[in-house]
Amino acid sequence: MSVESRLLVIDAGNTSIKFTAFEDDEVLWVQRGESYSADTEFVPDVIYFASVRSKELSALLHADIQAAFPDSKWVTLTSQANACGVTNAYSEPERLGIDRWLGVIAAHHLIREDAVVVDVGTAIKVDVVNKKGVHLGGYIAPGLAMMEESLLSKTARIRYDASEVVAGEGLPNSTARAVSEGCHEMALGFLERIYQRYQDFQWVVTGGDAESLLSLLGVSLERQPNLVAMGAKLLGDEEGRENK
């Protein structure tokens, strides 16, 4: 059970913000967007805030949410050397992205075995944590949309409409398919190399593009769409107990 009964977790990613509401240990609803559409019936006792955005953008979001819920306790989550039974691999632990840290914490508590954590969003993030809770490190690679956007922004004549991206068999026979499927192949190759080394580990996946990409990999895995929010709840609740 949470230290506080009603909890709002804010996961501010690079391109979208995810709001997850908890009542004790139950997820009530999840909302995505650049701003919070207030649920007048839900007033959180506490807000756990995790952001990979700049200090300036994080401060603006903080101010907006605090205006909506002036009486709610606010906790900003940061990456640490040790928390929730997990040891951070980084020599400068605060430099590990908070989204990665929360994913590792949640995966360790869910699996309790050697685990690979994959978050497929703006970037593809992979972290490895052993059954003792030792974070072994990980990787960051461009996500599918980022790869496509980078290619289009750095070339003069690779152009197509989104409507041209349609599934087909065999080698791509259009620019749209060549780019889309080429980026998928790069991402799959990256993940397949990691799988060759860690195929005996449990794989836990999250993120908006996880389903479409990892279904092609043929890996036995556990899907957890709210993994980062679960990690935020674990870390925030631990900090709340320690500060009582």
Residue ranges of each PLM-predicted region?
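N-terminal glycine/serine-rich phosphate-binding loop of ATP-dependent small-molecule kinases
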Residues: M1-A83
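Active-site neighborhood for divalent-cation/phosphate handling
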Residues: T76-V117, A123-I124, H135-L136, L171
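Glycine-rich phosphate-binding loops at beta-strand->alpha-helix junctions
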Residues: S16, F49-L57, E181, F201-L217
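Glycine-rich phosphate-binding/hydrolytic loop that grips phosphoryl groups
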Residues: L221-K244
